[in-house]
Swiss-Prot record:
The keyword Secreted does not apply. PANTHER family: PSBP DOMAIN-CONTAINING PROTEIN 4, CHLOROPLASTIC, PTHR31407. InterPro entries: Mog1/PsbP_a/b/a-sand, PsbP_C. GO terms for molecular function: calcium ion binding. GO terms for cellular component: chloroplast; chloroplast stroma; chloroplast thylakoid; chloroplast thylakoid lumen; cytosol; extrinsic component of membrane; mitochondrion; photosystem II oxygen evolving complex. Keywords: Chloroplast, Plastid, Thylakoid, Transit peptide. This is PsbP domain-containing protein 4, chloroplastic. Belongs to the PsbP family. It comes from the Eukaryota. It is found in: Plastid, Chloroplast thylakoid lumen. One of its GO terms (biological process) is photosynthesis.
Amino acid sequence: MMETALLRYCVNFSGHKKISAHQRSNSEIPKTSPGGCEDEWCARVLSRRSVMASGLVSSTTALAFPREGLAVVKQGLLAGRVPGLSEPDEEGWRTYRRPDEKSGGHGVGWSPIIPYAFSVPQDWNEVPVSIADLGGTEIDLRFASPKEGRLSVIVAPVLRFADNLGDDVKIENIGQPAKVINAFGPEVIGENVEGKVLSSNVAEHDGRLYYQFELEPPHVLITATAAGNRLYLFSVTGNGLQWKRHYKDLKRIASSFRIV
């Protein structure tokens, strides 16, 4: 509208005597008294007005459609190689390692989160984490595949559950597998897990224990361990069809979780 009005002004005064240079300033439109609109000056002003109008339209669009704007920003950040995610190996699997510089710490006084790693098929990608999600700010990461399922990593301070475990906690210090899943399973599925555990297993890698659980439908695999002053809950899930078709891959993903 601003640009159209200015263009109409310039057209209306074309053909009149040119205004002298000392009668106008850079920020002033010529008066309607004898004089006119120089083509070069009009073009320069219109160009400046176009830039201002374009900026105004862009700002208004971002305010009116914040979700779309944020989605574009997020898409730009995630385009190409995701930070922490390796190139596919010969089987088409990639390894994600939490970047050392990634933010997160759950409050003043907490040490940096000790990095973790896991492997996923090539079509799995990181998705945004919302504070409105189950688990709130303790969800450190989400990945998903439209075909196979989704996963999340919850990193919870153990001080929430016990205050005498120190700053270098092992999962066995918290308790046996049954105690851990009953206490922390609700952090993952949002409800009591009593009677829902189909199987449990204890694995050891590089001297660290990992408790592995499979829960009944809605299907979920949970790997739990502890490091520093935090408990790590790695969950992998899918709908009924995904579970049936891709159980082997989902199981492999869940078993790949490591503290590094």
